Amino acid sequence: MTTNPAIDDDFTMIQSIINTYFTGLYQGNSDQLKAIFHPTAMLKSPGNFRSLERWLEDVETRATPKSLGQPFNFKILSIEIIQDQAMVKLECPLFDHFYIDFLGLLKEQSRWLIVNKMYTDIAQTSDVTAV
């Protein structure tokens, strides 16, 4: 089996972005999060659409999982890369919630950025369906 070094590099870069995402969420570091999102990114959950700017304000003003002594239990569930686009599925336990995030990333000018975040709290429902 042969590997493609470009895909391996992309995979490593995306993993690094996701690790930054996890750390930023855990520590409430909005500057760290802002650096990995495209400025026009939208964050969406059922009934809740926010701009990146609004979400970062929310992150800055809430308590952090780290300050509350909560465990760092974030997990990458999958990464799919097709040329200059990627979709990442994550587990993000935060506070009393258990979020599943889908992050859409695009690679432009050799740099990956998160352009879209969709998330839902599966702690409130048992509606998890895979096809």
Residue locations for each model-derived region?
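Surface-exposed, charged secondary-structure patches
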Residues: 6-13, 42-98
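Beta-strand-connecting loop/turn residues
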Residues: 39, 84, 110-111
